[in-house]
């Protein structure tokens, strides 16, 4: 498939033109014209680039790419090595950030709901969803379910929280700042990737369960599901590579 055609297909699927983002979405670095082997991953780190070379991939699709709004415009050290790897091997680098967080089927938030069997009821903010569990469960039962589905036990704050959880709000990645707005919807629990110092006090004083699973863990499934969709619909060769990241 032509590399610019692939960009157009994904932009249309993810409705990329509807979002104002802090990073360019789409084909960030042009490589070989014909896409034959795609690697997907969360972040375009050097380890993922090295894996792409190992598997003879000509294309990378990630959630966290390059050229962020507040990023230094100087190409030194780490960034120089990354770009050198991409350019010298004629690799296409694609990245979709917010469009891949919020897509109603493929997005990170939708994938969290799918994994945890949560019925989506609506959105609190564009990047924050809320829904209901199939059955009421204790906070510890919900934490154990998260561990089973994500292969990682979350940080769980539960002091002053209700015994049972049925109404849940969530936001992939760095969503801890939305906790107060989410609580206005009468939720029992809030799940996100990151946690801040003040989150402990906010969760306790608002009387909810708070679960932090890690930024990386909550944002693996969006780009993975995008790759699987490309494989099903266009018969492209796609593999997801998970570079370990505890954060």
UniProtKB/Swiss-Prot annotation:
Sorted alphabetically, which InterPro entries does this protein's record hold? DUF34/NIF3 (IPR002678), DUF34/NIF3_sf (IPR036069)
Q: Kindly indicate whether the keyword Metal-binding belongs to this entry.
A: yes
Q: Where does a divalent metal cation 2 bind?
A: 64, 215, 219
Q: Which Gene3D superfamilies match?
A: NIF3 (NGG1p interacting factor 3)-like
SUPFAM superfamilies named among the record's database cross-references? NIF3 (NGG1p interacting factor 3)-like
Q: Which GO terms describe its molecular function?
A: metal ion binding
**Gene Ontology CC:** cytoplasm
Q: Where does a divalent metal cation 1 bind?
A: 63, 101, 219
Which Pfam families would you find in this protein's record? DUF34_NIF3
The entry's keywords: Metal-binding
Q: How does it assemble?
A: Homohexamer.
Please give the family membership noted in the entry.
Belongs to the GTP cyclohydrolase I type 2/NIF3 family.
From the Swiss-Prot or TrEMBL record, give the protein name. GTP cyclohydrolase 1 type 2 homolog
- Phylogenetic lineage: Bacteria, Pseudomonadati, Pseudomonadota, Gammaproteobacteria, Enterobacterales
